[in-house]
């Protein structure tokens, strides 16, 4: 009986539909983050098993920067500096090829205040004392439904 069942399974296996066993969408590897010299960040991603529907990929974060003033002698002002914050988001639409998408998205740093806005005079310079991208998330949607989401976390520049 076991031999007959095994023979039947081997014979019928090629006829069984594989659609019930389709893989779920996933990132092929963990999205990779790059800290760029211009203080922006870039996230590289590669996902598969997305089917044929156009994917909308979004990278978002909350950015926070502390800006200080530097006098003509190169000394940092003893003031606490100026805090600046922004919500950042970058999106792209991609048509999957063989169910796969890959690419990169970049988030720019927040708009920093000008020298005249925070320093005693125009002869001073501004300096970024700290910059962080908080809750960096990459999300893939198809037909307005979330398919994939990866929380990268916080990134300091």
Put a short name on every predicted segment.
Residues 10-19:
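C-terminal segment of classical bacterial N-terminal signal peptides
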Residues 1-6:
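Bacterial N-terminal signal peptides that target proteins for export
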Residues 22-157:
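Mature extracytoplasmic or otherwise solvent-exposed domains
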């Amino acid at each position: 009986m076991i031999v007959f069942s095994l023979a039947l399974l081997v014979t019928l296996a090629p006829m069984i539909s594989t659609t019930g066993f389709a893989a779920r969408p996933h990132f092929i590897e963990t999205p990779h983050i790059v800290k760029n010299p211009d203080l922006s960040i870039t996230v590289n991603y590669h996902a598969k098993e997305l089917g044929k529907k156009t994917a909308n990929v979004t990278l978002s974060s909350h950015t926070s920067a502390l800006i200080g003033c530097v006098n003509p002698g190169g000394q940092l002002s003893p003031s606490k500096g100026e805090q600046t914050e922004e919500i950042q988001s970058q999106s792209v639409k991609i048509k999957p090829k063989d169910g796969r998408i890959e690419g990169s998205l970049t988030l720019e740093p927040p708009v920093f205040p000008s020298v005249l806005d925070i320093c005693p005079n125009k002869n001073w310079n501004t300096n970024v004392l700290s910059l962080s991208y908080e809750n960096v998330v990459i999300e893939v949607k198809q037909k307005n439904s979330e398919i994939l989401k990866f929380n990268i976390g916080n990134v300091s520049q």
